[in-house]
Each structure stands twice: as C-alpha cells, then as structure tokens.
C-alpha cells in the first residue's frame, strides 16, 4: 500500500532536489563526505540526516538509492562487525582467523571457524542464494527487495572507498573488502536458516559415511530419554528472546493502540540492532531497528502502525530417518527404491596450513546430519542416517515482509503482508495501530508437520522427541511420510497462513517467547499443531510476570505511552515476589543465624535475612538486596528441580500464578543462601550493595550501571550479565534488552514514539555514539522519536550529508 503524497512528500522531495537549503554541520572525523550543495556526480545517492544519538534519517528517490544510503550509514557505524559477517557468509573465517578459532555465533551455531566455512562455502558453491534471488515473487524476493540489496552493497562499498576506518577492531585489516548484492542476500539467508541448518552446521559438516566395522554396526538410534532432554535443551538455550505487547483502543486513554517492543538480542556481534528511518517520498516512511546487514527495518513503526517481534516456539526443522542400502551407506531407500546421496565437496583455505577439503552429503530431504547440538548425536551407521529438513533454506522473503509492514496503514495490512509473503522464519509478530487495533500472530515458516503425520510416520526416536520438543523424526523410507502442502502456502512443504495462530483486537496481545497459547490469558489460543509450540505447559518466570503485568495494565485502562515506559523500567523480579519473603522469614529462624554451605562450612547468614526482607523485589540500579537475591536464586535453581522447589505445582487452569510457594524445607535452600553470602563476601561486595554498583558494562574508562535481570529472575527488562568476582561483579552483558520502542498516537500527524538502543549505534570505541544510549538505558531515559519532517528539521544537532557512489 502506497503513501499518499502530501506536505511531507513535498518537503522530502525538496530535500532531494534542493538539498543546499538544508543546514549541515561538520562531518564526523572519519567521514569525508559531500556537502548537501554538492551532490555526487552520478550513480546511486541518498541524503542522510543525523539527529541526536547518531540516528540517521535516510532519504532517497527509489529503493536502490535507499539501499545505498542504508548501506553507507550502517558501514559508518558498524563496518568491522559487518565485515566480519561477510567473511562468515563467504566461508573465509579459517583463511583470515584460523580454522580452530570460534566465530561469534551470530550467523550460525558453528563451534569453530572450519565447520562454519565448510557450510557457507557449500552454500556458495551450489549457487543456493543466486537461485533464490532468481525465483519470481512472491516465492522469491521482489524487485524492490533486490534493488535494496544492490543499493546496500553499493553504499557499503562507497563508504569503504571514500572513508578511513578508525575502529581498532578492523583498522587496516585485509578481510575488510567490498561486497556484492549476493553477499548481502547471503547474510539474509544465514539469518533465515539460523534455527534450522544454521543450528546444525557442525553436524552437517562432520557427517561422513561409516568406514570402520564398529561404526557400521553401531546402533543408530540414541537413547530416547536423553535425546528428548537434549532436544528440549537445544531450543531452551537459544540466545535470543523478547517481550512485546500491543494494547487495543479499549484499554487506552484515547481509543488508539499502543505497542511496547522489547527484543532481547546479543549486545555484541552480528545480531545487534541498528536504528534508522527510511524514506522514499510518497512510497515508504518507516523508522525502527534493523539487524545489522539488513536492508530494511525489522522492528519499528510508521505513521499509523507499530510492530515488534518475539522469537517463536515453532520448531523450524525436522529430521527424516533414512533406511540405507546395506551395501552402500550413501544410498537410501524410499518405497524400496534406491536413491544416491548427492556429494557436495568444498575446499576451505586455512591460515597456517594447507587447504581443507571435505564432502557433505545431501538427500531429497536436505543434508545428512550427525548431531543437533552437542547433546543430541545422530550416528550414521550402515543401516541408518538422518537428514535435516529446513524450509527456510528456500526463504529469502523477509525483506519483502518488512517492506510490507513499512507500507502498512494498520494491523490488517500487517496480517495481509504476512499471508502474502510468508517471510518470517522464527519469530512472532505483535502490532498495534492508530485505529485502536491489536494483533498477535505466529506467522512463521514451519515444516508442515501435522500431529497426524507425526503420529503416523514418527520413528522410535521421533516418538520420544516430538511430544516434548516438537522435533519430528519421520520415516524417510516411506513416500507417504513426505511433508504435504497447504494450498495457500507460498512454498511447498510448509503450513499456509490459514493454519497460523492469530489473535485480533484483544484488549492486549503479549508474548514473552512462550507459545501462542496465552497471548491473552482471557482468550487462549488452541487447536494448532504441536510443531507451533505447546499448549497447557508451564510458562517461564519472565512470561508469568509479563502476563500478570500487562493484564493488570489492561484492566486499569486509560493507558498512554508513559505507562509503556514505566513497564519497561519497572524491573520487577517475579521470582522475588514468589520467594523472597519466605526466604527471609525462614532465614531469620535458622539456629544461630547460620547455614551450611556446599563446602560443609557454617556461614553466618543473619545479615542476609534483613537484607532480603528489606529488598524491594526489583532489579533497579539503586536496589539493595537485588544482587544477593540474584546470586542466591542462581545457585538454588541450579541444584533444585522444579518439582522440589515449589509446594504448589503448576496448573494449566492457573498458569500465571503456578507453581508457587517456596518449599523452604528443600535441602538446597539454606545451602544456596550460605554459598551466595560467602561468594559476595569473598569478592568484597556488601550484602546490601546497590545493584548498579556491581552490575555494569565497561565502556572506555567508564563503568555504566545496568538495570534489569535474568530470564530466571523473571524480569521484563531482561539482561544476561557476565559474572567476574575479581572485577567486582557483573561486568558485561551478553544478551538482553536491545532496540526498545514505546509507540502510540494522539490524533496528530506524527506518532508518539519513544525509543532506546541499549548498546548504542556504534561498536567503534572512537565514535561519539559508542555508549551514549547505554548511559540513557542506565538512567531509565528514552530518545524522543523524530519521525516527522518538522521534528527532524528542529533537531538541535542536525547534521545533513549527501552521499553518492562518486566523489
């Protein structure tokens, strides 16, 4: 849907055609750019207007130019991280960094560079991405998406050619090189398969036919119970999460919608968000956060609708158990007929050694895989092997989904876009609009595993895995066990839109990486297949706290953006509400005020009793007792099973409030408290120290206090910090709150939006935007969005540049 030209379009066109009239300031020291009054001498170009905190507002005439400006601006902030990712998708990490070094995990789960390279070199050798680019839309990317990719590559390359790198992470590095549109698309592909082939890179690249007698006769089916536990852990330990809630007009002060998006993503590496506004006058005007290397806004808003995403519970892969020809382990049988596996031989250059050549083995179902994570081996024997199906290996449609969101005029258009493109691989969508509508949908690309198919075709291993984890293991020797197709699906072998869980216009729609079941606790969603996620299962502590919070907000009503802001930084620890008072009470009656630690020594915990009693149950930087409770809770949950921890077990009839009531007689409670007290004292940390004194990130020579708490603590404002007792506590954040947005409408022409990029725009320590928003996050402050032209033009630090392919 296109935007009607109006006053905004007239102003924007004027900027493009007469940019000399705009104010400009001196360039950043690492950019040599054109004055707005001196446009480039031809080729692609864009106008970039920087407002506070280094947020670029990119203005272009068409999608190729928009991609150009986006690629340029991303490179200016994140060139080293981007270049590192392009080394990954080109399969060149071993060449530049050594085969045994560890990648950052942002584009696959490979444990070392060599398997990462073997996988991505295989993708390149077979022209996988090029074939997807050649598919006509909607199965393949649209012309607009391809123009964005082409422009992005040109913009990135132009920045490299016209600027010097000041980031010490890659200054002068030979691995920082120009890219192509295929490289940009390959990064999109890597993100798409992150939950499928990307999760199994080590198992794909290690797969070899059995050579020894022992290997040929080994039992091919892992122990069912241990396999089921490993499968659950595989998906439980993902490093990405999120919260998001949409409120309908029935709950708000003005009858319009509200949206709070709070994705929890890595603070370092290639899955960081980067903030911008993208504008083509009369065509597109969207602002928000994009994953690095992306050509489009991933989570954001336009003038009428706002959306966010959460990592979904849908299982984006399945396995096919192959019955092999006894005479040849590289031949498998389907309905009794032999089919040869396809060899994919790739060579990887390795620093300090000869090139490494390996062969991967592929079937009609996908690659042969010998493990899913470290805990789920899938041995290849003379009789059995396993092939992995990942439908997102045929999905390069995410940019078109994002473009559709950017053009949407309401939640109905968001849903239409999802149905038309089916481009989201592993995320839910939560949205609200100015008309007062709310939306939750788990519209993602999933293998078409119906419960009936799993029941009819699961192998022994599949019968163990599917009910508990949603991973189907189908009998690959039977043609009638192939994945079918829905008539409304964009590609074969996946569910069509009609089968996706959808909740429209509920008072609130919320997700915290739980299943679709309780997007609204008063309107549960049921009837979907197990592969989408569980129904009637316990919620995480974070999800329980989130449901309680947003349902109370909806019941209160009269909500505004300020209420969203308050929710984001309430920092309530749900686990503290559940057990802190009971722990303090039982602590106070311990004989002699002592407890026995895990080392068998008595520890005086009497001071801890009062600290826990006085704690406000929050993870705010000024909270006293938060750190003590955090260290206690970590130790307690590490050694005590949920069945022993609670007196009142989980009930599907009351999922938000159960389980509850701490079993203080559990043997681990007093021990965990003693160990936490000993740990803090040994580190020289007072039991009643403020959280902000010992939960920090270090940026330059500055320690910045960090609010929030862990998944286990059940804090909406999630952070997963790194403990270093010798450095005084938590000194870095691995994952957590990232691009946050609170969006509403007040009847005016501009949305009411507040945003925050917790780790800031740039990873370059020499940038003024290396930690400026991190300091805001520390203080619970926000950035007021400058979406409309009048707001951009009135920015006190406005800096305008025109960038082009030629100087």
Regions from the PLM with identified roles:
Residues 56, 60, 65-116, 308-355, ...:
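Gly/Pro-rich active-site capping loops and adjacent beta-alpha segments
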Residues 59-83, 274, 363-378, 384:
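Short, surface-exposed, low-complexity cationic segments
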Residues 626-708:
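Charged, long alpha-helical assembly modules
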Residues 286, 317, 424-553, 633-638:
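Hydrophobic alpha-helical segments
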Residues 520-598, 690, 694-807:
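Terminal end segments
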Residues 34-258, 263-269, 280-283, 287-290, ...:
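Substrate-recognition/specificity elements adjacent to catalytic centers across diverse enzyme folds
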Residues 280-292, 296, 300-305, 309-471, ...:
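Glycine- and hydrophobic-rich flexible loops that cap the catalytic core of alpha/beta enzyme folds
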Residues 1-29:
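Secretory targeting and sorting signals
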């Amino acid at each position: 849907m296109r935007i009607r030209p109006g006053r905004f379009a007239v102003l924007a066109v004027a900027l493009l055609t007469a940019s000399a009239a705009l104010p400009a300031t001196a360039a950043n020291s690492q950019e040599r750019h054109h004055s707005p009054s001196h446009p480039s001498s031809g080729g692609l170009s864009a106008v970039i207007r920087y407002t506070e905190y280094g947020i670029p507002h990119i203005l272009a005439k068409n999608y190729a130019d928009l991609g150009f400006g986006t690629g340029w601006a991303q490179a200016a902030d994140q060139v080293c991280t981007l270049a590192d990712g392009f080394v990954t998708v080109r399969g060149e990490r071993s060449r530049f960094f050594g085969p045994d070094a560890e990648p950052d995990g942002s584009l696959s789960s490979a444990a070392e560079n060599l398997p990462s390279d073997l996988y991505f070199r295989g993708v390149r050798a077979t022209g996988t991405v090029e074939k997807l680019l050649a598919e006509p839309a909607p199965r393949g990317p649209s012309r607009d998406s391809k123009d964005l990719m082409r422009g992005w590559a040109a913009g990135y390359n132009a920045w490299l050619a016209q600027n010097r790198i000041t980031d010490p992470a890659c200054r002068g590095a030979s691995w920082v090189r120009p890219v192509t549109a295929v490289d940009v698309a390959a990064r999109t592909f890597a993100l798409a398969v992150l939950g499928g082939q990307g999760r199994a890179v080590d198992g794909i690249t290690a797969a070899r036919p059995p050579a020894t007698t022992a290997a040929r006769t080994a039992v091919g089916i892992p122990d069912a119970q241990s396999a089921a536990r490993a499968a659950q852990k595989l998906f439980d330990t993902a490093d990405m999460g999120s919260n998001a809630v949409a409120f309908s007009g029935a709950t708000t002060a003005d009858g319009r919608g509200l949206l709070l998006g709070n994705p929890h993503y890595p603070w370092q590496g290639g899955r960081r968000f980067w903030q911008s506004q993208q504008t083509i006058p009369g065509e597109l005007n969207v602002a928000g956060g994009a994953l690095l290397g992306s050509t489009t806004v991933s989570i954001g808003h336009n003038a009428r609708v706002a959306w966010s995403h959460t990592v979904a519970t849908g299982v984006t892969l399945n396995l096919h158990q192959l019955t092999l020809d006894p005479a040849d382990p590289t031949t498998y049988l389907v309905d009794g007929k032999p089919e040869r596996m396809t060899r994919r031989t790739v060579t990887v250059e390795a620093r300090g050694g000869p090139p490494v050549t390996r062969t991967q083995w592929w079937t009609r179902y996908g690659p042969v895989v010998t493990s899913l994570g470290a805990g789920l081996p899938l041995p290849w024997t003379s009789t059995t092997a396993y092939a992995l199906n990942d439908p997102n290996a045929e999905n390069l449609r995410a940019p078109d989904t994002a473009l559709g969101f950017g053009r949407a005029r309401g939640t109905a258009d968001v849903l239409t876009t999802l149905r038309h493109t089916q481009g989201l691989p592993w995320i839910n969508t939560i949205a609200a609009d100015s008309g007062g509508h709310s939306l939750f949908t788990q519209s993602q690309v999933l293998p078409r595993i119906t419960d009936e198919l799993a029941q009819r075709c699961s192998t022994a291993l599949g019968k163990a895995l599917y009910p508990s984890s949603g991973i189907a293991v189908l009998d690959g020797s039977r043609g009638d066990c192939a994945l079918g197709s829905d008539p409304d699906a964009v590609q074969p072998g996946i569910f069509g839109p009609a089968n996706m869980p959808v909740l429209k216009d509920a008072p609130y729609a919320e997700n915290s990486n739980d299943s679709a079941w309780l997007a609204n606790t008063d309107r549960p969603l049921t009837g979907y297949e197990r592969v989408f996620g569980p129904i009637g299962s316990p919620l995480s502590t974070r999800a329980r706290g989130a449901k309680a919070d947003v349902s109370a907000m909806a019941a209160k009503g009269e909500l505004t953006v300020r209420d969203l802001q308050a929710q984001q930084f309430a920092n309530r620890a749900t686990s503290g509400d559940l057990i802190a008072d009971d722990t303090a009470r039982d602590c106070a009656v311990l004989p002699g005020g002592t407890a026995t630690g895990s080392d068998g020594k008595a520890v005086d915990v009497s001071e801890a009793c009062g600290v826990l009693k006085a704690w406000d149950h929050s993870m705010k930087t000024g909270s006293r007792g938060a750190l003590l409770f955090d260290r206690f809770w970590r130790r307690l949950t590490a050694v005590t099973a949920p069945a022993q921890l609670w007196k009142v077990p989980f009930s599907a009839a009351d999922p938000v409030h159960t389980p509850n009531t701490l079993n203080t007689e559990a043997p681990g409670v007093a021990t965990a408290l003693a160990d936490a007290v000993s740990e803090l004292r040994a580190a020289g940390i007072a039991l009643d120290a403020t959280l902000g004194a010992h939960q920090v990130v270090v940026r330059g020579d500055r320690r910045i206090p960090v609010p929030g708490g862990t998944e286990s603590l059940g804090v909406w404002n999630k952070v997963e910090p790194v403990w270093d007792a010798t450095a005084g506590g938590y000194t870095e954040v691995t994952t957590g709150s990232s691009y946050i947005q609170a969006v509403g409408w007040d009847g005016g022409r501009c949305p009411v939006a507040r945003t925050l990029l917790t780790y800031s725009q740039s990873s370059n320590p020499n940038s003024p935007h290396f930690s400026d928003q991190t300091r805001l996050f520390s203080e619970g402050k926000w950035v007021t969005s400058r979406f409309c032209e009048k707001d951009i033009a009135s920015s006190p630090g406005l800096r305008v540049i025109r960038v082009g392919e030629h100087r």
